[in-house]
Regions:
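Polyanion-binding interface signature
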Residues: 1-111
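Charge-biased C-terminal accessory regions appended to nucleic-acid-, cytoskeletal NTPase
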Residues: 83-146
Length: 146
């Protein structure tokens, strides 16, 4: 089995080297748990808007792990943000293979099989897919913040 902390460190390195990363993106990496978010998404304490994945003992046992988008308690006008965001992006998310709309602060989620063979590549693909939601997040944040 691969060293998962090392896998997450490698993913962080690749993300940071991406051409788009310097446009206000941040990473919170705690071993086998990672969030990707923009600086204006109210996620300074990991409780705002972010894309998230983790592979902890439960996921290893289940041989599957999630990648998701959350709008947690630090998101301004959280309920309104979620409602407006889903109105805007629901169809796009539903068109993505394997993605499900969530409940509460969990906007959407995909559960991936835990295959160590191309784990880094799979996670990069999913983070890049979720990044397509950036413009919608920005648009709705502007509406609910003012």
């Amino acid at each position: 089995m691969k060293d998962l902390k090392n896998v997450f460190r490698q993913i962080e390195k690749v993300l940071r080297r991406s051409s788009w990363f310097d446009d206000g993106w941040e990473i919170y990496n705690r071993g086998v748990y990672m969030q990707l978010y923009k600086t204006n998404w109210h996620n300074q304490n990991q409780g705002g808007i972010h894309f998230e994945t983790f592979i902890e003992p439960r996921e290893i046992k289940q041989k599957a792990f999630p990648i998701c988008m959350h709008a947690e308690e630090d998101c301004p006008s959280q309920d309104e943000f979620i409602q407006q965001f889903l109105t805007l992006e629901r169809d796009r998310i539903k068109s993505w293979k394997g993605y499900q709309l969530g409940d509460g602060y969990s906007i959407c989620k995909r559960t991936l099989p835990l295959n160590f063979k191309n784990l880094e590549q799979r996670l990069m693909e999913e983070f890049n897919r979720l990044r397509q939601l950036e413009a919608g997040i920005e648009e709705i944040l502007q509406r609910v913040e003012y």
